[in-house]
Amino acid sequence: MKKFISLILAISFIFAAPTMCFAESGTNSLAENKEEASSTQPDFGFSVRGALLMEARTGAVIFAENEYFAASPASVTKIMTLLLVCEALEEGRFSLSDKVTISSHAASMGGSQVFLEEGEQMSVEELIKCTVIASANDAAVALAELTAGSESAFVGMMNKRASELGLKSTAFENATGLDDTVTDHYSCAMDIAVMSRELIGHDIILKYSSLWQDTIRDGSFTLTNTNRLVRYYEGCNGLKTGSTDKAGYCVSTTAVRGDMQLIAVIMGAESRDERNAAARALLDYGFASYGLYKAEESFVENIPVVGGTCYQLPVYSTPFVTLVDRGGLSRVEQVYDIPESLSTPLAAGERVGQVKYMLDGQELGCSELIVKEECPRITLLQIFLRALSLIFCGKIL
């Protein structure tokens, strides 16, 4: 009888919820920094049609002025052209080494070009290089024809992709941005920044957009970057310029310093110098005023498990990154929402809590607390066997 009672008590002990308490919520304050950052957007006095500064990793907008004003983007159009080509490469529809035979239509393109001739053959990688560095219209059309069969079919892909990206003030009529005959070809600073952010995720783009000069045709033809900031601005690694009488001077400029990549878009400047000065001013402001707050994946603590085959599981926080004014980087606090115990069954990767990141009482965002191991619910047979081992061995085996 005594052993029967002991068995019942042992089972109750095994299945009961643990009473030990872990911090339900807490803060992990970083060093105090009394410097306050201004929330007022600066007035640069730009005389441009639109301007925007975005941090690439988070997509956070730092500065915006007439960011949805739709206008001709000129050759900045090729950001979408190159994006579709890169995505086709990823899908395996062709390779960088594939040779492309230039059509009469591609060879007929005016404006910026590398003077491709009908019937000439050039590799996909060389055509990308020509488009990225020299803004070559003939190379861009050759890539469009390779990707979709014709430039007109490619334009359909461009507009479809714009819709998928949620671009509200963008429409295309060609793959180049030549705008002397188009009537419905436009974009805005915000949409161009979104496209740019997608494009720089493809390594081959920054490989070439960061170069001041390169060559094609066995070194006999020199390509010079249309983006002078690549040569003269610290950290500039792209991306695309454009200018026509209708568009004025446009650019989507990317630059990286440390762990932060910025995208500065200028639409409709009156001169090349004004365009470059405006882009520089935005980039200078962004690098001087903002930084990335990052929390890497980390172990938090072991949490007891109720009714599972395991007794506790380690809990981890997922990575988190956000843009913060430099004056606030040292004041970000982590507030943990951690359960006292975990209920089964638990799957690997399951969310069990969260970490909130706070700055001066404002929530910046949150990351998840997860378990990396699964833990099934314990069966009655397993409970019984554990109880027996506790009674007869003095411990659970």
For every predicted segment, state its role.
Residues 167-171, 183-397:
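Domain-terminus/edge residues, biased toward the C-terminal soluble/receptor-binding domains
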Residues 10, 159, 283-287:
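Generic solvent-exposed, charged/amphipathic alpha-helical segments
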Residues 2-22:
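Sec-dependent N-terminal signal peptides of Gram-positive bacterial secreted proteins and lipoproteins
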Residues 21-194, 199-203:
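Active-site-adjacent loops and short helices of periplasmic peptidoglycan-processing enzymes
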Residues 1-2, 73, 124, 377-384:
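Structural motif marking the loop-to-transmembrane transition
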Residues 9, 37-39, 250:
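A generic local structural motif
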Residues 13, 20-38, 297-303, 390-394:
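Intrinsically disordered, low-complexity repeat and linker tracts
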